[in-house]
Every structure is written in structure tokens, then in C-alpha cells.
């Protein structure tokens, strides 16, 4: 590209770890990212929208499937817009299953995603840190995860004076290896 005008980073996890609710990396960081207001770059400035308020269906290649993706803030936006001066819009999208979103909604409704201290039995705890302690360890999920992930970039811009659009992606096959006998 001579100029990049739009960038959509799309992170789809089509894997299934068999747990009712778990995060694929640090639960405290994951839940804070998902529930935080969304920031995306548009026309020279960051714009803010409510968490999870923008979503769309996305059809991944190579039979990964169609997933609902949600626009959210991810820190790489900061450096990308700084180092790509021609960029007009930059967004980060991530997929979440309806099951994940329902569990997250219930946890928010009962206060378990709070980051301010509460007193329980005379001890101050932070609900989100307590939740992290009782959720499955993300490091253990690989043993039971099956499916595919697809992460990629949809990029538009100009090359040699002509409009150009590409989707560059990577597919990862997740599987559980058989137990040694």
C-alpha cells in the first residue's frame, strides 16, 4: 500500500473448551477489556462508544464459520494510528459466543465485574479479582480446546494510484492431542 485508509483487525475464536464460562487469557484483563467503553479511530481522532454496542456478522474463510464480532478497544490502535498517517479509520473486532455474553451480563448484573473494593466477612476484596480466582485457569484450557481461530486484517487504501482492498489472515487449528498410553 502507498496509503492505508481503513484497517479492521478481526479476532475470531471458534474454539470450544467445554467449560460453561472461561476466558482464554487473564480473566481480569479480558473482562475489563470487554466491558470498557470502545475507542476506535475515525477521521483523525479517537471516538468512544458504549462497550459492545457495535457488532456485525463476519464470515471467516476456510470453513471457520460465521461469527458475531464486536467492536472494542485494543491498545495496538494507539501505535497504529500514530505510525500510519494516512489512516482514516481503525477498528478492532472480537468474536464472543452468545453463551459468553450471557454469562458476562449476569456477572455484571450481580456486581462480580466491579473493580472497586467491597467488604466481605470483614475483609476487603475486589469482586473481579475474586472472580478470577474461581474461574478456570486459561493456561489449562488448551488441553480440552477444539476448533479453529481466525485472526486477520481487512485493509483498504491506495496502491500505484488505484484503490486496493485485501484481507490478510491466519487460521489456527485447535485440537486436543490424545493422551499417551
Language-model features: locations:
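C-terminal catalytic/substrate-binding lobe primarily of soluble NAD(P)-dependent oxidoreductases
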Residues: 2-177, 181
Amino acid at each position: 500500500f502507498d496509503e492505508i485508509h481503513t484497517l479492521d483487525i478481526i479476532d475470531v475464536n471458534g474454539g470450544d473448551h467445554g467449560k460453561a464460562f472461561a476466558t482464554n487469557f487473564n480473566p481480569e484483563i479480558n473482562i475489563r477489556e470487554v466491558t470498557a467503553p470502545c475507542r476506535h479511530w475515525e477521521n483523525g481522532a479517537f471516538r468512544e462508544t458504549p462497550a459492545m454496542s457495535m457488532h456485525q456478522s463476519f464470515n471467516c474463510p476456510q470453513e471457520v464459520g460465521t461469527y458475531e464480532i464486536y467492536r472494542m478497544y485494543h491498545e495496538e490502535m494507539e501505535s497504529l494510528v500514530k505510525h500510519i498517517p494516512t489512516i482514516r479509520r481503525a477498528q478492532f473486532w472480537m468474536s464472543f459466543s452468545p453463551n459468553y455474553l450471557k454469562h458476562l451480563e449476569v456477572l455484571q448484573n450481580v456486581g462480580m465485574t466491579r473493580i472497586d473494593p467491597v467488604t466481605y466477612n470483614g475483609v476487603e476484596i475486589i469482586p473481579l479479582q475474586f472472580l478470577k480466582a474461581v474461574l478456570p485457569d486459561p493456561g489449562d484450557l488448551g488441553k480440552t480446546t477444539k476448533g479453529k481461530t481466525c485472526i486477520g486484517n481487512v485493509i483498504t487504501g491506495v496502491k500505484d494510484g488505484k484503490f486496493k482492498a485485501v484481507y490478510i489472515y491466519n487460521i489456527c487449528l485447535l485440537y486436543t492431542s490424545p493422551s499417551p498410553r
